Amino acid sequence: MTIRPAYRPKIIKKRTKHFIRHQSDRYAKLSHKWRKPKGIDNRVRRRFKGQYLMPNIGYGSNKRTRHMLPTGFKKFLVHNVRELEVLLMQNRVYCGEIAHAVSSKKRKEIVERAKQLSIRLTNPNGRLRSQENE
């Protein structure tokens, strides 16, 4: 039986389009990743009509759904079995995510313990391989 979140609202983003860097469409050497314009005459910085929009605090997500996954859980990074037990009382709000640097031996232990504590993991199959027949 899978664990379901205690509270699962509809996640609404105020803006789904990415903020792109000024003149990144004009020059290939400029990446599309956002950089705040600092020039004294810059039209984007001065917020002229028809220019790219700048990110600001008003585009932030709802406080209740911020950092929430589409499943309705919030992520918690787990490096060992002991860190998994922090989620014991919060298993309907948080789900564990096994850290990148964890070995496959420790991953197996974490997955087993999570199943016992009924804690959901986002990546339970990561770097786990069943034995191949020879």
Curated annotation (Swiss-Prot):
One of its GO terms (cellular component) is cytosolic large ribosomal subunit. One of its GO terms (biological process) is translation. The keyword Ribonucleoprotein applies. InterPro entries: Ribosomal_eL32, Ribosomal_eL32_CS, Ribosomal_eL32_sf. GO terms for molecular function: structural constituent of ribosome. Keywords: Ribonucleoprotein, Ribosomal protein. It holds the Pfam family Ribosomal_L32e. SUPFAM superfamilies: Ribosomal protein L32e. The keyword Cell cycle does not apply. PROSITE patterns: RIBOSOMAL_L32E. Belongs to the eukaryotic ribosomal protein eL32 family. This is Large ribosomal subunit protein eL32. It comes from Drosophila pseudoobscura pseudoobscura. The lineage of its organism: Eukaryota, Metazoa, Ecdysozoa, Arthropoda, Hexapoda.
